[in-house]
UniProtKB/Swiss-Prot annotation:
Enzyme's top EC category: transferase
Entry similarity comment: Belongs to the RNA methyltransferase RlmH family.
This protein's record includes keyword S-adenosyl-L-methionine: yes
Name of this chain's protein: Ribosomal RNA large subunit methyltransferase H
Name of the coding gene: rlmH
GO cellular component: cytoplasm
NCBIfam families, sorted: PRK00103.2-1
Record lineage: Bacteria, Pseudomonadati, Campylobacterota, Epsilonproteobacteria, Campylobacterales
Length: 150
């Protein structure tokens, strides 16, 4: 299995994420994080919400894979517990997660993904990545009946 988390963010070292990446390998899952922040995104965010959202879509589009499960994290989307999250991931070999910038996703981009919400609360990119990586590991623990999830 391969899970890739794409986000509109400047890169930052996250030690906890590295721990979850290592733990996911136990389940033969490569957990990869890719931070994207093209120059046009920085400029677009200064101009308008619509332009910013378009720049996020343009940054993410090369990574949308029709053969993979594409999941966009969106605050107004479906949410559920860790068991529901694990069911969503089960039986997929390639999963791409997308975390938009401050202005969120364009509606057109969301049409190409399944939308999922981690919470009603707003998180920084760093916190969202940590929560997502932990939930991916927890989902794998549920799927493979590992005692991490009790």
């Amino acid at each position: 299995m391969r899970c890739v988390v794409y986000s509109i963010a400047k890169s930052s070292p996250l030690e906890l994420v590295k721990i979850y990446q290592k733990q996911c390998k136990r389940f033969d899952c490569e957990l990869e994080l890719v931070d994207l922040f093209p120059k046009n995104t920085a400029n677009a965010q200064k101009v308008s919400k619509e332009l910013a959202q378009k720049s996020y879509s343009l940054a993410f589009e090369p990574y949308l894979n029709l053969k993979a499960k594409n999941i966009a994290l969106h605050p107004k989307a479906q949410r559920g517990d860790s068991f529901a999250f694990s069911k969503m991931l089960e039986n997929h070999l390639n999963i791409n997660f997308f975390i938009a910038g401050a202005y969120g996703f364009e509606e057109n981009f969301l049409k190409d993904c399944q939308a999922w919400s981690l919470s009603e609360m707003t998180f920084s990119h760093e916190v969202a990545k940590i929560v997502l990586c932990e939930q991916i590991y927890r989902a794998l623990s549920i799927i493979f009946k590992h005692p991490y999830h009790k």
